[in-house]
């Protein structure tokens, strides 16, 4: 974190809650959204906040996507409350479990992003619906990102916070050193950064 901070880069940790968390079930023998699971989760989060100061990580991504739980609103309220009690701002995937007002949405579905109207979207948001490097051929990414309209708006605003380019290492490679080029990271990053820095249609 200190290394990134010295170079003007903010780290936004993501702790997936409760989606993509099979490791939690295997380790503790219960689901994260169960009563016992939430008690364990609270201890883990408090340790995280104790170890990493607010000034180093003012945001915490709480995940929330691709999962169904018995009480989605209650679970989200539980997570958001702990995050806010430690003076952090929660971020959650959209679509995902229903967030509270004030939680930043990270949009990952093109069908939502393409229809996005920042006047009617109920919260601040981050554009990632065009930013999945593993979602198309690396040869196509450069033109896709360069022609993309960031946040579906001509300029930034209080709601449109920018974009995050996502590198999920889903492309199988025989050598870990090939992950970046096989996912189109170098050329994709250049086009994505240019569009989000300049903005406009």
Region spans (language model):
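Substrate-binding cleft of carbohydrate-active enzyme catalytic domains
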Residues: 1-86, 90
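Small-side-chain structural scaffolding
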Residues: 2-4, 17, 21, 90-92, ...
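A generic structural signal for short, solvent-exposed coil/turn residues
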Residues: 3, 54, 84, 97, ...
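Structural preference for beta-strand elements that scaffold enzyme active sites
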Residues: 8-12, 57-61, 89-91, 102-106, ...
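Active-site-proximal loop/turn and secondary-structure-junction residues that shape catalytic pockets
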Residues: 15-21, 66-68, 96-98, 109-111, ...
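C-terminal intrinsically disordered extensions
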Residues: 80-89, 94-100, 110-111, 120
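Flexible, acidic glycine-rich loops studded with aromatic residues
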Residues: 100-103, 109-201
């Amino acid at each position: 974190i200190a290394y990134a901070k010295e170079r003007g880069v903010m780290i936004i940790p993501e702790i997936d809650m409760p989606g993509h968390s099979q490791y939690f079930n295997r380790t503790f023998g219960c689901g994260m959204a169960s009563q016992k699971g939430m008690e364990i989760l609270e201890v883990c989060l408090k340790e995280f906040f104790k170890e990493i100061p607010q000034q180093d990580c003012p945001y915490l991504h709480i995940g929330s996507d691709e999962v169904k739980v018995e009480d989605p609103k209650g679970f989200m309220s539980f997570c958001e409350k702990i995050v806010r009690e430690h003076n952090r701002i929660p971020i959650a995937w959209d679509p995902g479990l229903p967030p509270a007002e004030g939680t930043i949405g990270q949009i990952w579905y093109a069908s939502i992003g393409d229809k996005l109207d920042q006047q009617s979207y109920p919260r601040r948001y981050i554009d990632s619906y065009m930013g999945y490097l593993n979602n198309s051929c690396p040869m196509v990414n450069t033109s896709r990102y360069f022609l993309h309209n960031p946040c579906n708006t001509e300029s930034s605003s209080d709601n449109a916070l920018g974009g995050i380019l996502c590198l999920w290492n889903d492309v199988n490679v025989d050598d870990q050193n090939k992950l970046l080029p096989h996912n189109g990271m170098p050329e994709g990053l250049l086009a994505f950064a240019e569009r989000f820095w300049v903005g406009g249609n």
